């Protein structure tokens, strides 16, 4: 053993002498990275005991942001997808619900109304208050409309019909316009009540359970 002295104290520390020519094989490296890997926000973060009514969600894009961040499903990191082509910004915090999956093979999207922007990669508790059916370039891409369950200004809302009409118009206009300068068509249909959102989340939870089960059986 080679002894290395800590100059800041009288205490010595002994470390094994290592051969600098030794390299890790793939098996060693895989075991090491598995032990030290960060949690995957889609799979490792629990959705919460009150789901599908109140649930955890991960923020990808902060309120007021123009950068379109999204989850990289392989690594679990948040990547930059693009910068919005227009001058509009996200009206509220936007992210996804862990342990859900939709028909497009992505986790369920959620727009969370609250007072302040939240850092990308943070997670919070949200309450479903409505569903915004949306068609993005011919494909279904519905959004859950939610409020932060721990924000005193918004947590009392239980259904989307309780929101001021201007707030709904703001949300609709953003999603109708945010891809126009990319020559991409987005259609937003009539907002649906809280129960429709709760049912959609429950369906996405069931699809996720089936997705994981199928993966384990391969």
Curated annotation (Swiss-Prot):
UniProt cross-references to Gene3D superfamilies, sorted A to Z: Inorganic pyrophosphatase (3.90.80.10)
Organism: Arabidopsis thaliana
Catalytic site: 90 (proton donor)
Sites where the protein binds Mg(2+) 1: 104, 109, 141
Origin superkingdom: Eukaryota
GO-annotated cellular components: cytosol; nucleoplasm
Keyword field contains Cytoplasm: yes
GO molecular function term, any single one: magnesium ion binding
Alphabetized PANTHER family for the sequence: INORGANIC PYROPHOSPHATASE
Protein name stated in the entry: Soluble inorganic pyrophosphatase 2
Subcellular location(s) per record: Cytoplasm
Record field: catalytic activity: diphosphate + H2O = 2 phosphate + H(+)
Gene (UniProt): PPA2
Keyword Magnesium included in the entry's annotation: yes
UniProt KW keywords: Cytoplasm, Hydrolase, Magnesium, Metal-binding
Residues binding Mg(2+) 2, per UniProt: 109
Cofactors required: Mg(2+)
Chief location: cytoplasm
Residues holding substrate: 68, 82, 94, 178
EC number: 3.6.1.1
